[in-house]
Amino acid sequence: WLRIKGAEALAAIGKPAMQSVPRMLELLAQVDTENDPRGMQQRYLSFALFDRDGMLGRSLEGVDRASLYTAVRAGLQNQDGRARGSIGSVYRHLTLEEIKPLLPAIHQAIIEPAPSGEMFADEIRVEGLRLLAEHHIEEGMSALVFYTREQNPWASEIRTPELMKILLSYGKRAQVVVPELTKIADYFEKDEKDFPRELMRQKGQCLRETIAAIEASTDEPELTRIK
C-alpha cells in the first residue's frame, strides 16, 4: 500500500519525479501471484504512469522502449479493466515501427477481456481495434468481428456503430468477414436475450449498412500481419 501511495505521489509531483520512471516501469512488470494475486500494485502503477494526467500519459519522450514494452505486456494482462484501459495512451504515442513488438499483446488484450472492472474493460479493446485498423493489420478484422458479437451488451447500441466505422477503414478487404457479420446481424435482430427490441433492430441495421458499404467499397489497402 505504501508503494501504491508513493506512485500516486510521484505522479502528482510531475516532471521533477520523471527520474523515477524506469524503476516504476520495472515494478509494473513484476507479478507476485502469491502476495498480490490481483495485481493491485501493478494496477495503481498503471494509473500513475499511463492515465491522461500520468507521468507518461502525454509523452513517451526519453523512455527506454525495451522497459516500456515489458511493462505494457504485463499491464495488458492485469485483471482490472480500468488498469488495462490506462495503457491505451501508449498506443497513441508510438509509431507503427515502435508498436510492432507490442502487436501480439495488443491483439490478445482484445480477444481476452479483463475479468473484472467490466465497466471499463471495453476501452482498451476498442482502442486496440482502432490501432490495428489504423495500420491495416489483417488480424484486426477477425478480432473486431469477434468482439462485436461478444461485447458487453451494456451500451452496445452506442459501441456497435463505432466498431463498424473502424471496420470500414479496411475497405473491400473486409469482404472476408461479411458472412460472419451477416450472422451477427441476424443474432442482433432476432436472438439477443434481455436487450430492448428496438435497440436490437438498430444494431442489426447498423451491421447491414456496414455490409452494404463494404461490398460497394473500391478501397483496397495493403494489409500487414502480426508477426
Predicted region positions:
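Structural detector for internal amphipathic alpha-helices that build alpha-solenoid repeat scaffolds
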Residues: 1-16, 36-62, 81-97, 118-137, ...
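Amphipathic alpha-helical scaffolding segments comprising HEAT/armadillo-like alpha-solenoid repeats
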Residues: 15-31, 55-75, 96-113, 137-150, ...
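Short leucine-rich amphipathic alpha-helical surface patches
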Residues: 167, 185-189
